[in-house]
Amino acid sequence: MKLVVGLGNPGKQYEATKHNIGFMVIDAIADSVSHTPWREEQKAEVCSINVAGEKVLLVKPQTFMNASGESIGPLMRYYKIDPSDVYCIYDDMDLPVGKLRIRPNGSSGGHNGIKSLISHIGTENFPRFRVGIGRPLPQWTVIDHVLAPFSEENQEKVQKGIKDTVKAVLGTLELGIDKGMNQFNPKRRPQR
């Protein structure tokens, strides 16, 4: 069994914010495949899908971003899931809007939701699907940026990014993290 976790904040007022790109991807995955009804479990909204014969839980923690680990840690322990089987989808300001980067592990990079996960599961060794939200405007704080909706001119990039991430998550669930990174991470141009 695997957990696919999308990070975000609960509540209507946060639905369309950049910080909720993880929730948006989870909803898009659920919309693209057959799934069980959503239910509340361990401070999260959870449903099940099947990928290549394996049960996968789609998870949207309802604890607010900075406390996401309070939901994921107990879910992992209840279902006896190894950290390497927890795929986490979240926003990344260091990537351009809609761009995807898959990593097998790593530090929090200053992301408070990831800090909470690391704290509650006790390791940095879980796969991440980082979805770009771009940098704040010069006059904006980081909080202003992540809690604002995407601009109208970025909507096409956002929708493409969500679609690409859905494809990458489902593909990586079938292929494994190493093959998934090879197939779905952007290819680097050779140095000349």
What spans do the regions from the language model cover?
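Nucleotide and nucleotide-moiety/phosphate-recognizing core
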Residues: 2-105, 115-129, 136-141, 156-192
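Conserved TIR/SEFIR loop-to-helix hotspot centered on a Trp-containing motif
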Residues: 108
